[in-house]
């Protein structure tokens, strides 16, 4: 995470950076994000949830931070997601500016960097911790946000840069379980009652306690 932490130190100064790991045997990204938010005492404090391998641009991030304080929504400080992969990451490591590194454009990306308050995050249930290993927790979260808050996560014009990391298998029993759970989210799209029931059934995060009654 050093490249990401270095970027934040250089651009935002002495900010509170917390590294979160849930300790699950099978990596659980949704749980890591939820734990990070749950560690914030002030429900109105603006928080940046940043994957360990993703670097934002400064101006979109600052815009998202300012807006997230009052919008009641989660903000994504980008409209373009550049996956640098091995070649682009090697270029960056060698000193090439991020905006000049080779990349693959990932269409529809809704992960990497989130800007929110705890109140906004939990207002639509956070992320579903039943997603484990690779896949779908971000897409399911996006659908829940759209359905329960009547608006998609709000984007800010800009780019995020995802550095190379080892890919996880997109097959097997856990992947199939993730895909099946994602299908439930698709079926609940635009049905507020169905979505609330689906999100609230993620008891691992005690969602029923956090999700508002109406």
Predicted stretch roles:
Residues 53-56, 82, 132, 140:
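A short, conserved beta-strand element in the Rossmann-like catalytic core
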